[in-house]
C-alpha cells in the first residue's frame, strides 16, 4: 500500500510530541484536527491513482474502461488490473461519502452501534459490517511509532472470544485470555498490538517490537521470562522490576498501567468483541484517543453532532 497518505498525519502528530497539549488554543486545535481529518479522508476517499493497490508499484498504465465507463489501470509489476476505488473504503460500498463521514466520526466518538446506525441512517447489521471495514482500513493506514528514551513495556489481557469457543473462566492468565502487548515512552508515544492467547511468547514480542524501539533506549518491564530473549534481540538497557515489587531504582510501570486502563475503558462498553477483529478495534482506539485529545468531547459535539 502507498505510504504517501501517512505523511501529513505524521507531520501533524509530531507537533503534538514537541509541545504541551495545554499550550494549544482552540483555533490551533481545530486547524490541527482539520489537517489530520483531511489526511484521513484523502486516504479513505482518494480517487487519484498513485500506485498499485495490490503490490504498491508506481509503474502503472491506463488499460481502457469498464462497462460503466470507469477508467481501468494495469500494473506492470504484478500485471493485475484495477480502478480508482479498488481496495478503498468506497469499493463495493452502498454508502455515500457523507454517510461514511458520519460513521467515521461516530466511531471515533466511541458511540454504541445502535447510535451509529441511527446517525448514518442504516441498519445495525450494516453499521456493524461497515464499521469493521473502516477499522480494517484504519489499521492499514496507521503507522507504528518509533519509541525512545524511557519505555515502559507490559501486557494486558482481554477475554478470548471466537465462534464456537466456550469460556471456561479459568483463574489467572490462561488460554481463555488474549494478550495485548503494550509499550509507551515518556513522550506519550505508544504501540499496542494483539499477541498470543495466554502469556505472549518471546518470538511474538520480537516481531512486534523489533522495529519499534530505538537503540539507546531504556526499557522498563517486569521479570516475565519471555522478555529475556526480547532484550537480547534488542540489545538495549533493561530495567527489570522484580516479581512482587512496584519499582526499582525509581523506575515504575505507571505509564503503561495507565495505558492499560484507557484500553479497558475503551472496550468496557463493547461486549463480546471477537478476537479476530481485536486489532482493528485497537487501531480505532488510537485514532479515537488522538481525536479526543485534540478537540475534546464538547468541541466534537458542537462541530459534528
Language model region names:
Residues 1-305:
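Residue-level recognition of single "structural anchor" positions
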Amino acid at each position: 500500500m502507498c505510504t504517501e497518505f501517512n505523511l501529513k498525519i505524521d507531520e501533524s502528530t509530531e507537533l503534538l510530541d514537541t509541545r504541551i497539549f495545554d499550550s494549544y488554543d482552540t483555533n490551533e486545535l481545530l486547524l490541527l484536527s482539520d489537517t489530520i481529518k483531511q489526511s484521513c479522508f484523502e486516504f479513505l476517499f482518494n480517487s487519484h491513482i498513485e500506485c498499485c493497490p495490490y503490490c504498491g508499484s508506481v509503474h502503472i498504465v491506463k488499460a481502457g474502461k469498464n462497462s460503466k465507463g470507469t477508467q481501468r489501470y494495469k500494473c506492470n509489476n504484478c500485471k493485475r488490473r484495477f480502478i480508482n476505488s479498488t481496495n478503498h473504503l468506497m469499493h463495493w460500498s452502498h454508502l455515500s461519502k457523507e454517510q461514511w463521514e458520519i460513521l467515521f466520526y461516530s466511531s471515533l466518538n466511541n458511540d454504541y452501534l445502535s447510535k451509529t446506525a441511527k446517525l448514518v441512517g442504516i441498519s445495525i447489521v450494516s453499521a456493524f459490517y461497515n464499521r469493521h471495514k473502516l477499522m480494517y482500513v484504519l489499521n492499514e493506514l496507521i503507522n507504528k511509532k518509533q519509541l525512545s528514551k524511557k519505555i515502559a513495556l507490559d501486557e494486558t489481557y482481554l477475554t478470548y472470544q471466537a465462534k464456537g469457543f466456550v469460556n471456561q473462566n479459568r483463574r489467572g492468565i490462561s488460554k481463555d485470555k488474549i494478550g495485548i502487548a503494550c509499550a509507551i515512552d515518556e513522550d506519550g508515544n505508544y504501540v499496542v498490538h494483539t499477541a498470543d492467547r495466554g502469556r505472549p511468547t518471546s518470538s511474538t514480542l520480537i516481531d512486534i517490537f523489533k522495529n519499534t524501539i530505538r537503540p539507546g533506549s531504556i526499557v522498563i518491564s517486569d521479570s516475565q521470562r519471555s522478555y529475556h530473549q526480547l532484550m537480547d534481540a534488542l540489545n538495549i538497557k533493561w530495567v527489570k522490576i522484580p516479581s512482587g515489587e512496584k519499582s526499582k531504582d525509581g523506575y515504575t510501570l505507571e505509564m503503561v498501567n495507565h495505558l492499560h486502563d484507557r484500553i479497558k475503558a475503551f472496550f468496557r462498553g463493547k461486549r463480546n468483541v471477537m478476537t479476530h477483529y481485536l486489532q482493528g478495534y485497537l487501531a480505532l482506539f488510537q485514532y479515537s484517543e488522538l481525536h479526543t485529545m485534540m478537540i475534546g468531547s464538547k468541541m466534537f459535539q458542537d462541530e459534528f453532532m
